[in-house]
Design a protein with these regions (language model features):
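Asp-based, Mg2+/Mn2+-dependent phosphohydrolase catalytic module
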Residues: 1-17, 73, 107, 111-114, ...
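N-terminal helical cap/lid subdomain that shapes the substrate entry/recognition surface
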Residues: 2-118, 128-132
């Protein structure tokens, strides 16, 4: 059995780890341009699409094209669909938060981590609106480090340095685990910052044996022990 990690803080990616694209918003936006999808395939499409990218989001056209392909959108409709998703992801235009569907156990797991006395910081490559968007999803009061706000993005270690500062005095990289769903941004970035990464991989798509994996956030407790 893998030894548990003695830690004082847990960093979490946002998109793909605690929130996903809302399946009904995605299906509705595509339906408005005459493209039908299976809404229940949205989460699976995300995890398949994000494997090769450092950042997922409506503002990342390469990710969105792969996401749409995984949803079965025909190639000849792709560019139109990319525009539809980009518009949906712009809260100022759409009036909704695209990344607002909670992953299973997200709220309960974060609550249990905090009850155990561990600090929690959300570390996300985003557009400057992550904190307000996540607050609307039920995460008000959880510290958020947004790449656009701090001026560095995963895998740059500086974004993790900002998160360490936010976590509080005395928190060192060795005291922290970071949970993320991308190899390039989350796993490599955490390692570069001296932080132990845990790969959030619900579909078991990653076969690498050089880092830890969880399929659900509730599984984190198999890897962690709270340090006083």
């Amino acid at each position: 059995m893998t030894a548990r990690i003695l830690c004082r803080a847990v960093f979490l990616d946002a998109g793909g780890v605690i929130v996903l694209p809302d399946r009904n918003l995605v299906a509705g936006a595509l339906a408005r341009i005459g493209v039908a999808i299976d809404a229940d395939a949205v989460s699976r499409a995300h995890y398949r699409a994000v494997r090769g990218f450092g950042r997922a989001g409506a503002s990342n056209p390469t990710y969105v094209r792969t996401f749409l392909a995984e949803l079965g959108v025909a190639p000849e409709r792709t560019e139109e669909a990319v525009v539809a998703i980009a518009e949906l992801g712009d809260r100022a235009r759409s009036g909704v938060v695209l990344w607002s569907e909670l992953t299973s156990g997200a709220v309960a797991t974060i609550a249990s981590i905090r009850r155990a006395g561990l600090r929690v910081v959300i570390v996300t490559n985003s557009d400057g609106h992550a904190e307000e968007n996540l607050a609307a999803c039920g995460f008000a009061g959880v510290p958020v480090i947004d790449s656009e706000v701090v001026g560095s993005a995963k895998p740059d270690p500086r974004i993790f340095e900002a998160a360490l500062h936010r976590a509080g005095a005395g928190i060192k990289p060795a005291d922290v685990v970071h949970v993320g769903d991308t190899l390039a941004a989350d796993i490599a970035g955490a390692r570069a910052a001296g932080i132990t990464p845990i790969h959030f991989d619900p579909l078991r798509l990653c076969r690498a044996r050089d880092h830890r994996h969880v399929r659900a956030l509730s599984g984190l407790w198999r890897h962690l022990t709270a340090s006083s």
